[in-house]
Design a protein with these regions (language model features):
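Rossmann-fold dehydrogenase core element
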Residues: 2-15
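Short pre-catalytic strand/loop immediately N-terminal to key active-site residues, enriched for Gly-Thr
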Residues: 8-9, 55-60, 112-117
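Short beta-strand segments
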Residues: 10-12, 27, 120
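A generic short alpha-helical patch detector that favors 3-5-residue windows
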Residues: 64-68, 92-93, 118-121
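NAD(P)-dependent Rossmann-like dehydrogenase/reductase catalytic/cofactor-binding core
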Residues: 95-158
Length: 158
């Protein structure tokens, strides 16, 4: 009321913004022009202008996403150690693989399932590993984690 012409912007960058690789969800009230605010956040990564409802959804996916990725990275590194690799090499290999796969998905525009199919051979090693991960519930655990994050965000927002 004190500032009737003021526009409220809400932004949710994630922690990779600190190295210029962030993902920021941005919303503004009253369909305001977001050009200037988008430019600010583009300096630290990518920006998605979304509705208020989608801001919380994107927060559950990409705002909290680095935490999920670090758990996956740590698990992959532990797997590398389990099969005999030195820890630092396992961490580097897992991190570079995650980085490369993410970059490949972004730059190619190809659906992740197709990219996955391109690296799996019938009866091969990759599909054996994916099968074991699927049997262990990896896919549903990741989905359930994002849903739980959104539910908690909604609770905190009340």
């Amino acid at each position: 009321k004190a500032l009737p012409t003021a526009v409220l912007y809400r932004a949710m960058p994630n922690t990779p913004a600190s190295i210029g690789c962030g993902m920021t969800a941005l919303t503004a009230d009253n369909d305001a022009d977001t050009t200037f605010v988008e430019a600010l956040f583009n300096a630290v990564g990518e920006v998605a202008v979304v509705s208020e409802a989608d801001l919380d959804r994107l927060g559950a996916l990409s705002g909290a996403g680095p935490g999920y990725m670090f758990v996956i990275l740590d698990a992959l590194a532990d797997a590398g150690v389990r099969i005999g690799l030195p820890r630092q090499l396992a961490i580097k290999a897992a991190a570079q693989t995650m980085y490369g796969a993410g970059k490949m998905a972004l730059e190619s525009g190809i659906h992740p399932a197709i990219l996955r199919d391109q690296v799996t051979s019938p009866g091969g090693t990759t599909i054996a590993g994916i099968g074991a991960m699927e049997k262990g519930g990896l896919r549903s655990a990741l989905q359930d984690g994002v849903v739980a994050c959104l539910a908690r965000s909604n609770e905190l927002g009340k």
